[in-house]
Amino acid sequence: MAILLCLIFSKYFYLVSLSSYYTFYLIDTFHVSIQQAQVMLFVFLAAVAAGTFLGGPLTDRFGAKFVIWGSILGVLPFTLLLPHLGLTGTIINSIAIGLVISSAFSAMVVYAQELTPGNVGAVAGLFFGLSFGLGGIGAALLGAIADRTSIGFVYQICAFLPAIGLLGALLPNPRAGPEVAAIAKPPAV
């Protein structure tokens, strides 16, 4: 469970860096207008929503561990590239980041529920609460770093957060308990 919590930390700190400061990064780096930056933020957040939606069927098809591993580690090349791209590349890259990194949330919840059968509600509450809490702490911390350095520096250091996804290799292969299996099994038609 501790490994999953580290993965949640890396994922939500990175997501909050984009959702909270992406517009400032675009304005500062590319000198776009506030309105243009907000449209680009909308495009990123739409990709996050789509990735979250797609994560469920991917988890059903390939398994939670594979989706967690693929999502958090798979986003690393995109996050490492982001601070070094031009405007068009940044927009395209942010769409890829949103789609890939957000696809793991449902997989993480399902995986944690498989690790702790009988605590399905507690696990879901822990993960939702923790993700929002870490996001709030991340926004404040990254804002303080940006104030002391620059918004570009924040994106350079945040680019490495998904590397924490290497811990995914240490995730055990859980056996679904009857509670999780009953939830995960589609109803007969």
Where are each of the predicted segments found?
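Extracytoplasmic gate region of multi-pass secondary transporters
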Residues: 1-52
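Helix-to-loop junctions at the C-terminal end of transmembrane segments
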Residues: 51-63, 146-147
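Structural signature of the two symmetry-related core transmembrane helices
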Residues: 66-81, 156-159
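Paired small-residue
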Residues: 88-97
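Intracellular juxtamembrane helix-capping segments at the cytosolic ends
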Residues: 103-116
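A late C-terminal transmembrane helix in Major Facilitator Superfamily
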Residues: 113-151
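Symmetry-related core transmembrane helices of the 12-TM Major Facilitator Superfamily/SLC fold
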Residues: 155-171
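Intrinsic disorder in cytosolic terminal tails and internal cytosolic loops
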Residues: 171-189
